[in-house]
Amino acid sequence: MAKEFSRTQRVAQEMQKEIAIIIQREVKDPRIGMATVSGVEVSRDLAYAKVFVTFLNDNEPEQVKIAVKALQDASGFIRMMIGKAMRLRVVPELTFSYDNSLVEGMRMSNLVTNVVRNDTERRSVTGEDQED
């Protein structure tokens, strides 16, 4: 019977859960604020992990840089806590990266909404029939 997910994918999923809990409950750095772990990519040899995070108040790029730097500074502590929570021979070295896909998705959604609204207004002004 074939495995649905590789070991690296399973480790990445479990690490995502554990890192989110650790950041929420254990890391007490005020620079981080409300962080969400949106994904984890683990190397094939499980030596390195890239952690993608988003922040609740990510309007200012400077605040995002400060928060990512704070997470990177706390990576040793987070790695130690992962080692206690998960049974791994080697706990991956963590690298934190800001995930702007949520912000980009919202921006694209707003652009589409504006185009549809403008098109509807233009059609109502000119009296054209709506064509789908």
UniProtKB/Swiss-Prot annotation:
Q: SUPFAM superfamilies of this UniProt entry?
A: Ribosome-binding factor A, RbfA (SSF89919)
Instruction: Look up and give the organism this protein is from.
Output: Pectobacterium atrosepticum (strain SCRI 1043 / ATCC BAA-672) (Erwinia carotovora subsp. atroseptica)
User: GO molecular function of the protein, one example?
Assistant: ribosomal small subunit binding
Subunit and partners: Monomer. Binds 30S ribosomal subunits, but not 50S ribosomal subunits or 70S ribosomes.
Q: Per the record, GO CC terms? A: cytosol
Q: Which gene encodes it?
A: rbfA
Name of the protein described by the UniProt record: Ribosome-binding factor A
Q: Matching NCBIfam families, A to Z?
A: rbfA
Family label? Belongs to the RbfA family.
Q: Which InterPro entries match?
A: KH_dom-like_a/b, RbfA, RbfA_dom_sf, Ribosome-bd_factorA_CS
Give the protein's function.
Answer: One of several proteins that assist in the late maturation steps of the functional core of the 30S ribosomal subunit. Associates with free 30S ribosomal subunits (but not with 30S subunits that are part of 70S ribosomes or polysomes). Required for efficient processing of 16S rRNA. May interact with the 5'-terminal helix region of 16S rRNA.
| Compartment annotation | Cytoplasm
